[in-house]
Amino acid sequence: MVNDKLDKKMLKAIFTIGFLIFGQISLADPFIVIENKLIYDTENSEEATEIAFGHEEELLKILRTHTDIDTLVLNSGGGMIGAANDMADLIIDADIKTYVEGTCESACVTMFLGGRDRTLALGGKIGFHASWWAPDSIEEYYNSEKEDEGWETPFDFASWLYEDTQAEILTEFEYLLGRGVKPQFAIQTLRAGSDGMWYPRRKELLEGGILTE
């Protein structure tokens, strides 16, 4: 834990030095532009603690305004997968590179895979785990949607949820394979439960198609 805190402080110091040397363009938190690089950092942000809806809109504005950006630097523990999916689409459309300086976990990996070229800093980590849905959030969704969806009992909802989960897994696998990830590695991304995290070594990331170099 102490080392993690030191690593985060060091990362923030590196970014700060970069700002002083190259100049910084202030944007909506957690985005920062330094020359031709766009930094997306939810780990050292003053406001954003995770990938969130609204970030995809800001990313679109930035990429349209700063057309010289060719690399997205990521440092995030994840967040809302829907927002990550939307940003991944923008990254693919912009045909830019992605680079992990510190940590990229969970939904952040979806964004990372959108990169044309995908690289990892020495000591950087890329983490995978199974998705999850909090019980209270499931209950809230059921109560708000049951009339529109025609769920007469929780069992009707459970049946829908079973099918929807399979569809989401299929969509995720199609995305992984479409971005050049090897089928066997795609299966292994589910090895860690929703409360765990799998950090493959660099060799595994290269052989699995996550890193391009």
PLM feature segments, named:
Residues 13-22:
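Sec-dependent N-terminal signal peptides
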Residues 22-28:
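Sec/Tat signal peptide C-region and signal peptidase I cleavage site
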Residues 31-132:
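Cleft-lining beta-strand/loop regions that shape enzyme active-site pockets
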Residues 1-10:
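N-terminal secretory signal peptides that target proteins for export/translocation
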Residues 137-213:
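Charged, glycine-interspersed solvent-exposed loop segments at helix/strand-loop junctions
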